[in-house]
Each structure stands twice: as structure tokens, then as C-alpha cells.
């Protein structure tokens, strides 16, 4: 059984999100919905407290009681089950991919996308500090002179979905998670470097699934104004911020 969950992490208070489904084909694709006639179909909701702890309520024909794991707590009719997972505090735009469940052995393997060169990170409270890593570079195509590639295949409400639309669809629609965008762009012929420019895509691999934003402006002091979706304010919420010149040079920019 293959399951992909797209979640937004709250840094304060509680966040509640509901999902239902059985299968998905790729990261950041929607699932097919809960089916009561499917022996492996299920749905669940979960809350995330201020410490980043996950609290799950399961409904349907499968739940984590079928697994032998520990650490994060799931609730099904007020029975507690354990799941061996890491704590994901202060990350945004995460698609948690739980793959390769086998009912016979009752085991599970978590496959995480990594991909992409770019800014590495460390965290202090809710602040992300990046350090420079060389960006891949390739020339031949550009966002400004490109053409629309087709439908937006990224998950609605995520940063990748917003940026694809913001650039008019003039990039690939199957670049995967944000962490992979720099490499995918370079492979497709776009220029990727550490120099911000209006209309470029800012990309980083910080967190497990990275983040992308659209460059709205570059100020005279080198600071960069970006707009973005699902960065600290929930899926589907577009916000803007200004990044210092020092930090800006640590991100990848796709042109």
C-alpha cells in the first residue's frame, strides 16, 4: 500500500488536517479518497501541537496498529499506537511519503525525497539560517522567454503550485518537490545560480522537501522581496517577505 500525505506544520498552537485515500502516484499528487469497500483504504485527521508533536485519529480499514513502531502517537477510538518517526518542527511545505507497506510482514519503509543542491540550513526558534552551497548551472532556456508547459500538476496550496502559476507555467510541471527544482531546472536548460533577479524563482533545499518562492523585486541594498505560498501561514496562503542580501546569496535562483 502506498500513501502520500501533504501537510502544513504549525509553529504555535494546534493545526488540524484531514485526509482520506488509498493510493497516489507521485509526490505532491492528490490521493483518490477513502473507499469503505477497499480493505486497505482509510482516512485520518491529525493535530500538531506547539512542540511539533503529531496526534492522529484514524478511521477505516487500516491504521498504524498493524505496525510495530514507536515515538509519535496515533489515536484510534482513544487507543494509543506508536509510530517510529522524526519530529518535524518549523518546516514548511512537507509532503510526507509513507511507502511500501506490506500487510504480510507488517513492516513499512519511509522513502524521503532529497534532491537539489542549494542552501543547507540550521534552525534557531523559528528562524532559518542558510549557508552557501554551489548551485548547478545550465543555459539555453529562460523563464522570461519561455513558453507555457501545460497544466499545473503540483498540489494545490503548496509553494510549488503557486510558483508554477506565478511564472505563467513557463517551467516544468513535473519537477517534483521544491528541493529538486534547481537540478531539474538546470537539466531542462534553465540558468541556475546564486544571483537574485526580478522574475526568477528562489529555491532552497532547507527541510526535507525544500521551498520555492517568486522574486518580486531586488532592492538597492541587495535584499530580495519574494512572494510565496504555504510558508508559515498554511496551505493556500500567499505571503511576502524581504530576505537580506547576505541570506539571498545562499539560495538558488532559477532564471
UniProtKB/Swiss-Prot annotation:
PROSITE patterns linked to this entry: CHAP
Positions of the Peptidase C51 domain: 134-255
Induction, per UniProt: Activated by two-component regulatory system YycG/YycF.
Cleaved signal peptide residues: 1-26
UniProt xrefs under InterPro entries: CHAP_dom (IPR007921), Papain-like_cys_pep_sf (IPR038765)
Compartments (UniProt record): Secreted
Function of the molecule: Not known; immunogenic protein.
Record-given protein name: Staphylococcal secretory antigen SsaA
Amino acid at each position: 500500500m502506498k500513501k502520500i500525505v501533504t501537510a502544513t506544520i504549525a509553529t504555535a498552537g494546534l493545526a488540524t488536517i484531514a485526509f482520506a485515500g488509498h493510493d497516489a502516484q507521485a509526490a505532491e499528487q492528490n490521493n483518490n479518497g477513502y473507499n469503505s469497500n477497499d480493505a486497505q483504504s482509510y482516512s485520518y485527521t491529525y493535530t500538531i501541537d506547539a512542540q511539533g508533536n503529531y496526534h492522529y485519529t484514524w478511521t477505516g480499514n487500516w491504521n498504524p496498529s498493524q505496525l510495530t513502531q514507536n515515538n509519535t502517537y496515533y489515536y484510534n477510538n482513544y487507543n494509543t499506537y506508536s509510530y517510529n518517526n522524526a519530529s518535524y518542527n518549523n518546516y514548511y511545505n512537507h509532503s510526507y511519503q509513507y511507502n511500501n507497506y506490506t500487510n504480510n510482514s507488517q513492516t513499512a519503509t519511509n522513502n524521503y525525497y532529497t534532491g537539489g543542491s542549494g542552501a543547507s540550513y540550521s534552525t534557531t526558534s523559528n528562524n532559518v539560517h542558510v549557508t552557501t552551497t554551489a548551485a548547478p548551472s545550465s543555459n539555453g532556456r529562460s523563464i522570461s522567454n519561455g513558453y507555457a508547459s501545460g497544466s499545473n500538476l503540483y498540489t494545490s496550496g503548496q509553494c510549488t503550485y503557486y510558483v508554477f502559476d506565478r511564472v505563467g507555467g513557463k517551467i516544468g510541471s513535473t519537477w517534483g518537490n521544491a528541493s529538486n527544482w534547481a537540478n531539474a531546472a538546470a537539466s531542462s536548460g534553465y540558468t541556475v545560480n546564486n544571483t537574485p533577479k526580478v522574475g526568477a524563482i528562489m529555491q532552497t533545499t532547507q527541510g526535507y522537501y525544500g521551498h520555492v518562492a517568486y522574486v518580486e523585486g531586488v532592492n538597492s541594498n541587495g535584499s530580495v522581496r519574494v512572494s510565496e505560498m504555504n510558508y508559515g501561514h498554511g496551505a493556500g496562503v500567499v505571503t511576502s517577505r524581504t530576505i537580506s542580501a547576505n541570506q539571498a546569496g545562499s539560495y538558488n535562483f532559477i532564471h
